[in-house]
Amino acid sequence: HGTFTVPDAMLGPMYLVFCEVIDPAEPVSDLLLKYHSELMFQENSTFSQPYYSRHNWLQAKKGMVKPFLSTYYHTMAPYADPGTYTFWEHLYKLSPHKTHEEANFLMETRWMLYMEDADTLNLFRVIPRRWMADGDRIELSGVQSYFGPLNVRAVSNVRNNRIEASVRCDPAR
């Protein structure tokens, strides 16, 4: 279906980490990530149907900013159709307007902005650092999280070595 690496690169052992059968902190998770990155990807993205691959989830969990962003942009840029704002299923422009790809693009954007890890909520862990240039801000309003609706406002004041943030979520969750 477009590439012979599909079973290994997209539907293989990385799903054991994604489904938390293997803990992301275990050494074998790093081994799988390195193996996949070296043998199954080009520019940190799979050759076909890249939104099936879950190495980006592990990169986000581990706070690997540059690899995560490489995957994010090398996946989004060639698959997004600027005329329709939808995504192709394959790099060679077969099967347009795929809701699976569109939903996963949105989920990866969510992971970039906020991502739960057990009882911890990580905010802006793998965003491009330039998004927090002095005077810039990021706001999330009413986004859904495992902790209930979430409101976040972060304002950069890096000139004075600080970023100020306010976070509101349901304290009972």
Indicate where each model-derived feature is located.
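Carbohydrate-binding surface patches
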Residues: 143-173
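Proline-rich low-complexity regions
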Residues: 16-19, 128, 173
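Detector for Asparagine
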Residues: 44, 56, 104, 122, ...
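Flexible loop/turn segments at secondary-structure boundaries
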Residues: 78, 130-132, 160-161
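Catalytic cores of secreted or luminal carbohydrate-active enzymes
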Residues: 96-151
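Active-site core of glycosidic bond-cleaving carbohydrate-active enzymes
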Residues: 2-117
